[in-house]
Amino acid sequence: MLRKGAEEILILSRAFRYIKKTDISSVYLSKIGKGSVIMYSSVNTIWVLFGAALVFFMQAGFAMVETGFTRAKNAGNIIMKNLMDFCIGTPVFWLVGFGIMFGAGNGFFGKIGGIASEANYGTAMLPDGVPFWAFLIFQTVFCATAATIVSGAMAERTKFLSYCIYSLIISLVIYPVSGHWIWGGGFISQMGFHDFAGS
């Protein structure tokens, strides 16, 4: 039974090697038809939004884990800190962080071009078939979760206001700058680095 499962995994891994990223051009459209491209786009969008929902639920998971590791009197504080990560991180990332992460700039820091929108930043960073708003939601929940990960180490060690300032800094500077290096065309991506899992 174990051997059969290992063989199936090996077959799947070999099959995925041959899947290539296809260009949606006029030749491609004439071969498969417009309906297939719409389906391709819909599946990619659903997949990105499903991934965003899973990452969003990580917020609740981290809140539960951290609450379990702390004393009962600090449970409300921990849950509020995890909620504030998303409440602070979302507007900060939409107003400034997205521009730092995906704006045209140098290899270290993107240029802020206004609030996160397709009109301000274009579509060059988008995966094939994924609309801007779905990509923005995906990146936003990752930004908030990045701030939440560290909150477990700060549980029962910081005051609430200090933690809110920390969350602001993570969402405004640390996550967008390090994200620009890899996903925004920064110096690490220019060296040929590819990050497939978001780590």
Regions found by a protein language model. Give the residues of each.
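Hydrophobic alpha-helical transmembrane bundles of multi-pass membrane proteins
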Residues: 29-199
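Short, Lys/Arg-enriched N-terminal segments with co-localized hydrophobic residues
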Residues: 2-38
